[in-house]
């Protein structure tokens, strides 16, 4: 029920927001805050609950495919924390947007809730087609928010964003359709098994189609052409969501869909690792020369996400917890900085850092909070960013000293551009005179401060994040195992029912034919899937052993039952003679 609520309730909230009056933004904001806090509470409960799954509901069948597409949600540590970022950043966006879009706040809140629902669906979908549906559904509300609430070039930014993301995902849609048509269903294990029956060249082609969609969404160099203008022209609350939550869908895709399904050659692994490091270096260098505050933060985000991609393809044992901590830390710090940059633009009337300056003197509370969040984003010891980046560096060291050294250079560059950013915005003298605009409200300051405190708490005790990877619910795994082989389960149930009623020899033969043990390839793919979804070595070994024993026991029982039935039939036939 909790998983269904987190995916479907935001869309319901968007519909309910339509009933509020456009002329009464206060009532709209109160209702939006109520929904926002409720969704954050649900996401926290989801993290505490551990791995869980809904019942797999048959949705529809793709023409030419053997199996059906399921509405099936599954939560693991990585997905649960991404949902927390989605709901948390959306709540802060609703809070900051209340003071920025007073006259049209209702429409702003409607689009935010629709975007939240699509993001949550992306991070919780266990069916590949369902995942792709939500993956693409994120584009529409985000584009509407950019076009309706963005800056001077908002229409160009919205068009660029939509074209890049939709065109980048088109090859994945074709590849997914082809792969689903070869598989029993569109769940991870079935897709992985179907892929094994294809020749290496086709496997590589399908892999590239999937990779392209995730490379564009993250984005990774050279597929980043949409990012700078989109983040700059989008309203600051949306920019915070784009960088803090929506961009994580790309990295999430690498972990949850690429690694479990596709066999990766070392050439692909090395290529992706160095592409991530190139992105990290490129983003840091572009941030060093940026004068637009939001573009600087966009390139900074690109650099950190490039480091996360490199960490994913280090494929070390510590990869998943390292990348998870880095993603959570980046989501909180980058999101907070975009919110603050939006408040600075509202106050000073510009986001050009050369024309800002002296905000610490003109607005001391804002200046103090801005400096506090900037220091936290530098990944100093004691912060979540430090834990995430240090553990990713250790993961890269497993691939050799050179990748780790390149990543270390990125961290030095990040310190350089962030210190320059702070110096230009809150210290010195402004390059022009301006009348003070709207100041940061107490609610805005409190919500952003909480994000900063969370970075400190998670830095002191990162187990708050990584423990979610160890929480284990057997019922969720049983449900997952049940739907990975739906055809075999249905056939087995049908045959057993027939055996009870007919007792015919050919039915007994069917029992023995259907009740086949899981092959080593099946078990290997299942182990890879469980590992990618955060299960520990002990949990995976225990589950695989149980499934193997259950499978062998069921086969033995089926054959024994068939033999006994055949013997009875022979005896009955001889008596009749």
Where are these regions (language model features)?
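Cytoplasmic/organellar membrane-interface segments at the starts of transmembrane helices
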Residues: 234, 363-365, 418-496, 500-501
